Each structure stands twice: as C-alpha cells, then as structure tokens.
Amino acid sequence: MGEAMGAADIRRVLSLLPHRYPMLLVDRVVSMVKDQSIHAVKAVTMNEPFFQGHFPGRPIMPGVLIVEALAQAGGVLAIESLGLAGSGKLVYFMGIDGVKFRKPVEPGHLLDLHVTILQAKRNICKFEGRAMLGGQLATECQFTAMIADPPGD
C-alpha cells in the first residue's frame, strides 16, 4: 500500500507547482497517497477571469480548464511521490484521452479533483482524473504527463 502523505495547504501547493494566478487551479490538497492518488479542491468563484467571456449571463468554467485543474493535481501527486519537491522539475502534458464533460461547473461550486496514477515508468506517468461536484461526476479523463527539467536547463 502507498504511504499516506496527508493534506497540503496553498503554500505547499505553490511550492510544488510553477503555476500562478490566473492559471493556478488547485487551492489545496485534501489527501494524498504516495504513488497512488490525490484528492485536491478548486473553489470556483465569479472572480475567475474566464467568466467574463465564457459565457456572459451564463458563466460556465471552460472544460479545458477543468482538465487543466486535474492535470495540476496530478502534477502535485507526481512531484510529491517522486520526492522532487524543490527540484525545479516541471510536469508537462503529453496526451489526453477519453474526456467527457457531464455537468457544467459554475461560480460558487467546489470542484473536487480526484486523480489516480494508472502507470508510472521512469519520467512518464499515466493518470485517471475525475472532477466531482457534490459527489456527482462533472468531468472525467485520462492523461499522460512527463516530468522534465524546465526549458533551457
């Protein structure tokens, strides 16, 4: 069994991900099991800049940003599981498969991000992600990412 790694507040998330406003889409980690899974959350507010144009009068979080939130949660899981915190390594998308959007995500929602590692080989991980709203599936996908040095290193 994997080692329980516990919760992480926004300060820890900021130390693990290079993303900053407006692209940081993980607010905190509820729980994490090394080499296995993470449960993180994103509080979706009307202050998100994308709601200005998506859509006026009917704000809905863009699906690609829900997938990005899942990928960021997966990045936290990968960096922590591999003991790479503080290394400067980045997690890059390589592919996304089987994305399904089932419920719209709106201002005021708390988006629960559940990501599981399906496979890890060297510096490449395959994940399964589920974004939930109040226990109901909003978005699901599988994605592959590579852990590597930043460009220019």
Curated annotation (Swiss-Prot):
InterPro entries reported for this sequence: FabA_FabZ, FabZ, HotDog_dom_sf
Catalyzed reactions per annotation: a (3R)-hydroxyacyl-[ACP] = a (2E)-enoyl-[ACP] + H2O
Classification via SUPFAM superfamilies: Thioesterase/thiol ester dehydrase-isomerase
A GO cellular component entry from the record: membrane
Active site: H54
Listed GO biological process terms: fatty acid biosynthetic process; lipid A biosynthetic process
Keywords, alphabetical: Cytoplasm, Lipid A biosynthesis, Lipid biosynthesis, Lipid metabolism, Lyase
Predominant cellular place of this UniProt entry's protein: cytoplasm
Subcellular location: Cytoplasm
Superkingdom of origin: Bacteria
HAMAP family: FabZ (MF_00406)
Family (UniProt): Belongs to the thioester dehydratase family. FabZ subfamily.
Purpose of the protein: Involved in unsaturated fatty acids biosynthesis. Catalyzes the dehydration of short chain beta-hydroxyacyl-ACPs and long chain saturated and unsaturated beta-hydroxyacyl-ACPs.
Name of the featured protein: 3-hydroxyacyl-[acyl-carrier-protein] dehydratase FabZ
